[in-house]
Amino acid sequence: PDAARTALAEAGYDGEPLRLMLPPPAYARRGGEIVASQLRAVGIETEIQNLEWAQWLEQVFRGKDYDLTIVSHTEPADINIYARPDYYFQYDNPEFQALMVEITGTSDPAMRSEMLKRAQRIIADDHVNAYLFQLAKTGVANAGIQGLWENAPTQANDLTGVSWSE
């Protein structure tokens, strides 16, 4: 905490409280409590505002009126949202946008993989968002089904490799 307080002072942080706007899911509400506590520990007063989905969509997503929020972005190819400067977190990096156009026009899997690694590095280096945790995915399936992912990285189920065992 001391190093963080020093860094904040060096950056000229004026002590302005932050508004942490949280949608209804438990991961957001509980995560918000933890984040606010950690920020307070280094001297950043954080006001939690629990919103209903309609309020979150109107104020945060459409209105872009927030300081901090927690929301799950786990859709396939979600990285494309970072190439949209009008998206709610308003990230605007022309280098990243050009790279995403290049990725879209590339069909070679190895080249796409390398380009996506570069894109992820840009996002990480620019500190666009903080990645707090991987959502737990709980599921129940018939023992005769094979090919379902365990600990899948997205909320959707990829059924292309699923079949009934004999």
Question: Where in the sequence are the language-model features?
Answer:
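Short, solvent-exposed loop/beta-turn-alpha elements that line the ligand-binding surface or hinge
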Residues: 1-2, 60-65, 81-107, 135-166
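Append "and occasionally in soluble cytosolic enzymes with long acidic Gly/Pro-rich linkers
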Residues: 1-37, 92, 118, 122, ...
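Sec-exported extracytoplasmic/periplasmic mature domains
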Residues: 9-14, 37-44, 61-65, 74, ...
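Hydrophobic anchor at the start of a short beta-strand
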Residues: 18, 46, 130
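Extracytoplasmic/periplasmic, Sec-exported soluble proteins
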Residues: 23-31, 48, 52, 71, ...
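Solvent-exposed loop/turn segments at secondary-structure junctions
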Residues: 24-28, 53-55, 73-77, 121-122, ...
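Periplasmic binding protein-like
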Residues: 30-31, 37-86, 115-116
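C-terminal amphipathic alpha-helical "assembly" element
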Residues: 36-47, 137, 146, 157
